[in-house]
Amino acid sequence: MMSDKVFKTLHARFQIPDNIPIYLLGKFEKCYTGKTADVGMYNAMFAARLRLPLTTLHRQLANFLRLFVNQITPNAWRIFIGDEILWGRLNGGNHQITLDEFFWCYHPQHIVSSQGIYHFSARKKELRLVSDMPDCNRNWKGRYFFIKGMNWVCR
């Protein structure tokens, strides 16, 4: 669980707008999905460049996969956001990647050792736009917080 010192820096460090309330969980609470109206978020998701409020495309991704945003690994967010940026640059900023285009290159894959958690695997090596990934952070689920309300959903 994150300390209060870390909690106080979340808004500034991860550029979370002040109108999106965040809080730490109690001593025995876990960052599960679907057990509360509020949404659990992992610190590592923001280190992978996920930002709030979510873009419409990020929300569409979670809805299409029928997942909560915290069921997508930080490296999967890194792949999706990296592809989103590269796709826009390769198209002169005139075309945003669509889910169909993304899923032509990648497919969601369940992580066997982590129930309900998914990542993206390239369908072919040459279709992998984001190839430089940090080492696997097996402790990424240990630092989390909750977001209240609905202001985080879409910008």
Which functions belong to the PLM regions below?
Residues 1-155:
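Residue-register detector that marks a fixed positional context within folded domains
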